[in-house]
Amino acid sequence: AFTFAMVSVGLAAPAAMSHTPWVVGVSLAFSTFFAVAAMIIAVLKTALALSHMLSKGVEETALPTLWIWVPILTVLAITLMRQDHGISHTLGLASAGTWLTPLLMVVSAQLFVLLLGGFAMRNHRYLAKVWRGDVKGAPVFALICPGVALSVSLQFLINKGFVAAGLLISFSMVYWIFSVEPLVVMVVTIIVFMRLSR
């Protein structure tokens, strides 16, 4: 699902950057196809995984994948913003309006996924094992992607959501207070990455 989401965001780039209507149209069509495919695959995989987890529990090696929805949602949100830019600027159609509500929904879903995954990881003491270095290998690096994705989503929420809706003034004191949150998430992610790389 994440692969399809990444293809989708790449195919949405021409919609955001091109001034040629047919290029924007092709970009919209293909990026939408891959975005929908990513969502269908992610929902089906999640349903199957939940069924398995409820009957047999979670294997420790699969724990990092519990947070995969976080980067998928970020990438799909970027896809939609790129598409919206092409629709409103190049095709001259009215924009769908503010991004505040969709971005709040994305960040809320991401926080919910992080909480659910965090509870499962806590039951296995997985994060403590990772921090001590007891868990090694490539799968553990999947813990980095959600941190990066959440930081990006929070930046979009602040700038394309709160500022664009007039709830925050760019570079005001409150703006900088809000901006500390994604920076903290990124710093923690970098620290975890450095710890895993030892």
Task: Locate the predicted segments by residue.
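Extended intrinsically disordered, low-complexity coil regions enriched in Ser, Thr, Gly, Ala
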Residues: 48-64, 128, 163-165, 174, ...
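Extended helix-rich, non-globular scaffold segments
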Residues: 76-80, 90, 130-135
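Extracellular/periplasmic helix-loop-helix junctions in multi-pass membrane proteins
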Residues: 17-28, 87-100, 154-177
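Hydrophobic transmembrane helix segments
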Residues: 52-53, 80-92
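Alpha-helical transmembrane segments
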Residues: 55-58, 118-135
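Membrane-interface helix-loop-helix junctions at boundaries between adjacent transmembrane segments
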Residues: 1, 15-35, 51-61
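Hydrophobic cores of alpha-helical transmembrane segments in multi-pass integral membrane proteins
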Residues: 1-11, 30-48, 66-83, 101-124, ...
